[in-house]
Amino acid sequence: MDEKELEKEITKNVIAYLSQDKNEEILAINKERIFLKLEKLEGMCNQNFLVSILEKNSNKILLQLVYKKFGIMSKTGDHLLESYIIEYLSKEDIGPKLFLEKKNYRLMEYIPETRHIDKEILFNERILNQLSLILETYNHFTSTYYYNIIDNKIKIEPLYDDNTTFKRINITKTYYDNIINTIFKKAKNSFNKFRNEFIQKIPLKGNEESHKILNKFKYYLDNFQENFDKFYPKEGFLVMCHNDVNRYNFIQKISDGKLYCLDHEYASLNLPGYDIADYFNETNFHFVPNYIFSFEQINYDKYFSKYKIYIKKFIESHKFLCNNSKGKNFIDFITSRKYYLSLHQIINYFWFLCCMAYLDFNSWYSEKKKSFYIAYDLIRFYEFGLEKLKI
C-alpha cells in the first residue's frame, strides 16, 4: 500500500470513529468543519501516525490521536491480550488509553510533549527506577505461574497464594509455546523458501561467504530445539512480560521525565528478569532512522550488577515463592550469572527466529543484499555463538 492509499485508509477509519464515538469531547466536534493532518511517528515494525483533527476556518487543533497500523512482524503477536494490557497500564497511569481496536489498526490516546528515551540516558538511575516499576507492574498483570516442560510441551499452573492487590486475569499464552509452535515454524518455512531461491539465483563462485552464512543459519534452525532447550529452564515460574523492551517502546514526558510503556504485541508469560535483560540487550542497537550496530559494543557482563538490583526488587515483591523448596531453588537460580546469560541467549534466539520468519528473497535482492532482517540475523547469530561460549 502506497502512502496516498494509506492516508485515505487512515482518514476513512478516523472519520468513522469520530462519527460513532459517544465521548462528549468528540460529540462536540462538527464533522463537516474539520480536516485531518497526519504525521508519521518513529516505529520499527508498525506504522504509527499522529492524527491531528483541526477546524477548517481557524486551523485550531480540536483533538489528537495515535493511529497504529499493524506491521508484518506484529502478526506473531496477540492483539486481544495487548488491548487488555493497554487498559490495565492506562489505569496505572503508565500507558496511553485505548480508544478503538480493529483487526488491522488501533486508535490510542496521544500523550503530548514526549519523546523516546534518549540513548545517552538509558542507564540513568531515575530511568532504571521507573523502568523497574513499570516492569514490576507488568509482572503483576496476572498471577505468577508454576511451569514445567516435558517433551517440548509446557504445562502451567497459576499460584493463588500471591498476596498482592493487583487485578488478575487468566492467561494461558506462554513465550515458550509461542516460539515452539508459532514463530519457529514460520521461520523454518520462510527460510527454506529463501534458501531455495538463493541457491538457484546466487552462484557459489564469488559468493562463498554468503553461502557459508546461509548454511550456518540452516544449522541453527535444524538444531533449534536442542539449542533452545539448553537455555530455557525445564521448570520454574512465569510472570507476564513485555518481551520487547527497547527504548522505542517507551516515551518520556519532556516536562517531568515520566515514562509510558507502548507496544505489547509480544507480551506473554515468560521468565522473571527477561524484560530487564532484554532492555540491556537492546541498548546495543540503534534502529531508526538508520540501522547502526557495532560488534565491539557487546558486553553483557557490565550489566549484570544492574540486573541483580532489579531481581532483588522482584524477589521482595514475590516473597511467597520462598514458601517451598522449588521456589527457593528457583529464586537462587535467577540471581545467578548463568541464568542471566541464558536470558540473553533466549533473547537472541527469539529475534533471530523473528527475522527468519519474515525473510523474503525478492526484497533482499532488490535492496542489494542489505536487508535489515539479514543484518539483524547476522548480529543475533554472532551474539548467540559468542554468549554460548561464556555459558
Feature locations, PLM:
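A glycine-centered beta->alpha junction motif in the catalytic cores
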Residues: F70-I72, N104-F123, H140-T144, N196-I199, ...
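Active-site activation/catalytic loop segments of kinase-like enzymes and analogous catalytic loops
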Residues: G273-S325, Q345-W364
